[in-house]
From Swiss-Prot:
Part of the 50S ribosomal subunit. One of its GO terms (biological process) is translation. This is Large ribosomal subunit protein uL24. It comes from the Bacteria. One of its GO terms (cellular component) is ribonucleoprotein complex. It comes from Xylella fastidiosa (strain M12).
């Protein structure tokens, strides 16, 4: 099954405390994604000299549910739904539903 979102896609948050923020997908874990500069939380870390970790409070991105994001359409500057188009040779392409443009091309 082809994924509607992929690592490296530009997305916009459509729900939650970070609604309206934009970022790039860093990691996908099942139905949750980590987006750069979105859902920043503070983590308390212990110092670990063997790994070179100084410890203290560290700001990092926490995962958010995939239903709270939409892929960003660069032509419109808004969030858009993702559709699929199957070519004659059997290749499956992701397209923007509003414009029909191929994603990532």
């Amino acid at each position: 099954m082809a994924s509607r979102i992929k690592k490296g896609d530009q997305v916009i948050v459509i729900a939650g405390k970070d609604k309206g923020k934009q970022g790039e997908i860093i990691r996908i874990d099942g139905h949750r994604v980590v987006v750069s500069n979105v859902n920043i939380v503070k983590r308390h870390t212990k110092p670990n000299p063997q790994r070179g970790i100084s410890g203290g409070l560290i700001d990092r991105e926490a995962p958010i549910h995939v239903s709270n994001i939409q892929i960003l359409n660069p032509m419109t500057g808004k969030g858009d739904r993702v559709g699929f188009k199957i070519l004659d040779d059997g290749c499956k392409l992701r397209i923007f539903r509003s414009t029909g443009e191929v994603i990532g091309a």
